[in-house]
A protein has these predicted regions:
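C-terminal tail/sorting-segment detector
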Residues: 301, 323, 328, 336, ...
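Beta-strand signatures of extracellular beta-sandwich domains
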Residues: 162-164, 310-314
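Short, glycine-anchored, charge-dense loop/turn motifs used at functional sites
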Residues: 313-321, 343
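Extracellular Ig-like/FN3 beta-sandwich strand-entry sites
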Residues: 244-246, 308, 338-342
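Exposed aromatic-hydrophobic patches
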Residues: 236-238, 331-336
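Residue-level detector of functionally pivotal "anchor" positions at catalytic/ligand-binding pockets or at interdomain
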Residues: 273-297, 304-305, 309
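Aromatic (Trp/Tyr/Phe) and Gly/Pro-enriched flexible surface segments
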Residues: 20-278
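Bacterial Sec-dependent N-terminal signal peptides
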Residues: 1-25, 279-281, 355
């Protein structure tokens, strides 16, 4: 029997019956993870929020529904360093709530934001964790980061987060707890995603704080529905896993330097899932056709592409390995020498985007 999606929303709005953002603050961490975030192909258990029982109601974690807010998923769960009630107000307001859980620091998230070996305190953070067993070989989920640090403090207060995956066969690039791998990295790099690594610069001090990876940044200063002044585009995590094996996932978000300028992570509904690693391309509708196929001579064939676009190829750790312009009518692109494995291809055009998984033998 298909699992029902549990997303009953308590409306917290500005009084307009056509609110663009609603939040449900009445669900437990277990309900949020297992009934809202969980998608097909995974079994989740042992949900815990910051050392609290899974049946607790916490003011930093809830479900949300969003309509026509650029960058945000259309619905899912939200994890914040402040209070959920502060999120739904105009962007020219201010979200500043000290954390209620009384935890002073965490080594892994401190290292993500400030560098390994540092002892800088993290005064305000949220941790959501759980065990899961994937049915298939690729773990995926989608998210966006929003913050009050944007834009004025983008270069000075790197509010950030980590998605720490641990379990059999996992060996991270850095010495995180339990040898975990941090999946929250910029495409094509090992740099963690945070406010300082993705921003549009400080408009009052561009000389000292220029834009950084601004292709992933969205300004939100004029939004009447959500308080955060900026956010990232919708980003996707993808990681190879072993089917049938239990893993541990720790989703952690923190303020940097002070507890007053809040940030939040918005996770797309039902996006935490596992999918098969296939030698065939997943069909992605493009006027009824599949748009990309892999050849055996280190090339990809492009089908049905009528307008100019950019082709981006990433490995299953989210690291970008290729970015090329595609001209109208172009039929193929030669690939560099890449290791055998599964890659994610994204077509980024003026009118639309599309994704597919391809296997390079």
């Amino acid at each position: 029997m298909p699992r029902a999606v549990f997303l009953v929303l308590l409306v917290l709005s500005l009084g307009d019956t056509k609110a663009q953002l609603t939040i449900d603050a009445t669900l437990t961490p277990a309900q949020l993870v297992q009934n809202v975030f969980q998608g097909p192909g995974v079994t989740i258990q042992n949900v815990q929020y910051q050392y609290m029982p899974a049946d607790s109601i916490v003011p930093e974690l809830g479900a949300f529904s969003a309509e026509s807010i650029p960058g945000l998923p259309y619905g899912g769960i939200v994890l914040t360093t402040g209070a959920l009630a502060d999120i739904i107000q105009p962007a020219d307001s201010f979200a500043s709530s000290e954390h209620l859980q009384g935890i002073d620091s965490d080594t892994d998230i401190s290292w993500v934001m400030y560098g390994f070996g540092t002892s800088t305190g993290v005064p305000d953070f949220s941790i959501l964790e759980f065990d899961f067993v994937p049915d298939e070989g690729i773990l995926e989920f989608a998210y966006a980061l929003a913050s009050e640090e944007y834009p004025e403090y983008a270069c000075g207060y790197p509010d950030g987060f980590g998605f720490f995956l641990s379990g059999p066969g996992i060996s991270g690039a850095y010495p995180y707890t339990d040898n975990a791998d941090n999946l929250a990295v910029l495409p094509g790099t090992l740099l963690s995603v945070n406010v300082s690594n993705i921003n549009g610069g400080d408009p009052d001090d561009m000389a000292n704080c220029p834009p950084n990876n601004e292709q992933y940044y969205l300004d939100n200063a004029d939004n009447p529905w959500m308080v955060f002044d900026g956010l990232t585009t919708l980003l996707t995590v993808s990681r190879e896993v072993t089917p049938g094996v239990q893993y541990h996932m720790r989703l952690e978000l923190a303020d940097a330097g002070d507890p007053y300028w809040d940030s939040a992570l918005f996770f797309q509904v039902n996006s935490f899932r596992s999918v098969a690693a296939s030698t065939a391309v997943n069909d992605v509708p493009d006027n009824g056709t599949s748009w990309i196929r892999c050849s055996t001579d280190h090339a990809v064939q492009l089908l049905g592409i009528k307008d100019a676009c950019v082709l981006r190829l990433s490995d299953m750790h989210g690291r970008e390995v290729l970015r090329r312009r595609v001209d109208p009518g172009q039929r193929s692109i030669q690939l560099p020498e890449l290791a055998s494995g599964i890659y994610v291809a994204m077509r980024m055009g003026k009118e639309d985007n599309a994704c597919a998984r391809i296997f390079i033998p």
